[in-house]
Amino acid sequence: MPYHTSVSQFLGQTIDNGALRIEAILGAGSFGVVYRAVDTRSGEYYAVKRVEKAYSDYYQTRETQLHARVSSHPNVLTFHREIDAGRYAFYVYDLCSGDLHTVIRKLTFFRDDELIKRVFIQIIDALDFCHSRGVYHRDLKPENILVSSLSGDIEVFVADFGLATTNKMTASSCGTPCFMSPGMHHLIEFDALFNC
């Protein structure tokens, strides 16, 4: 899929005083672009999200603060750092192989009951940790769960804390409609049980 020039203009360029070189586009959305980047010293690969600062004020700051608060859990995508680069902000994360949605739809090996249990336990453990730190994701869906590999025994990582909150009780509805709990759909006041 061809991308707009503003998306591809960073390919081959370095950021963070030459520490990271942007190599490929992983995806583009409404507010940002995610690239694969390599650490020029260690050779390690990372996912780097680029956001125009006009869009990164309050919401992106909140997202990164909440993500950083829970990033130490082994099943939460690791957030490494924020890079200020003039007009843009770059957010550096561990690089994963894909998302759970892709695994479920395209791969037959995900029909293994033991694998499903292991994945489910990893997700529940990550959410329990997030809740113990006062962070409520509110947009949990297969696309927001990244995977370590697209075959074999996989590890999963909860990602995308863009709708996360610290409010244990809330009456506002948010999330992806197909994945929202009935309580969210009916706009009743709900607590942390609904705020996965």
Regions found by a protein language model. Name each.
Residues 33:
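Conserved N-lobe ATP-binding subsite of Hanks-type protein kinase domains
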Residues 50-71:
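Conserved N-lobe beta3->alphaC-helix segment of eukaryotic protein kinase catalytic domains
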